[in-house]
UniProtKB/Swiss-Prot annotation:
Gene that specifies this protein: cmk
Protein name, per record: Cytidylate kinase
Keywords: ATP-binding, Cytoplasm, Kinase, Nucleotide-binding, Transferase
An annotated Gene Ontology molecular function: CMP kinase activity
Organism encoding this protein: Corynebacterium glutamicum (strain ATCC 13032 / DSM 20300 / JCM 1318 / BCRC 11384 / CCUG 27702 / LMG 3730 / NBRC 12168 / NCIMB 10025 / NRRL B-2784 / 534)
GO cellular component, one term: cytosol
Lineage: Bacteria, Bacillati, Actinomycetota, Actinomycetes, Mycobacteriales
Amino acid sequence: MPAGGLIVAIDGPSGTGKSTTSRALATRLSAKYLDTGAMYRVATLHVLNQGIDPADSAAVIAATAVLPLSISDDPASTEVLLAGVDVQKDIRGPEVTQNVSAVSAIPEVRENLVALQRALAAKAHRCVVEGRDIGTAVLVDAPIKAFLTASAEVRAQRRFDQDTAAGRDVDFDAVLADVVRRDELDSTRAASPLKPADDAHIVDTSDMTMDQVLDHLIHLVEASAERSNQ
């Protein structure tokens, strides 16, 4: 594996295996891991906890201007703190999932969190950064960019299985409808819409195992290192 500074940007919608693969890749590369999606989920939870309507942009901006957020960059840790309390389970709940697109679409919210994301990546020096706009907005100069995708049905099934395993009472059709709805919101928002960077490698994970996706990403990292050494 290449040593020294390294930034890998991994983007894509939910249900593509992005988080699991990004954590595994960071571990293989002995790198830090930054889940930017979790940061938007924490912001959404913070808004909901205060009884604010996510559609009230002014109130959301005010509530998230100073966010008491702390997130681990250890790929083996899922700890996410809001005001000192670990909320990693709460931010994956249905209410946050239904509202995170609305909160993250607000330009001022994105500006604040993007500044934090850039600072954390720079501090880590060697980091796998996962999100929806890393290659297109947050770290546009990242030497390695991958965009993971999969069909809506496959992604809905993965989320349904994940929620069921976590003991949540979910309906597949409702999960699929939410996946389609969120895709529409994320890809059409004015601020940093979800789309591949022009220089991103597109990886369709629909029929791939996590190990296959991981091997593919490692190949991209190694190929990038070889080009840099030429």
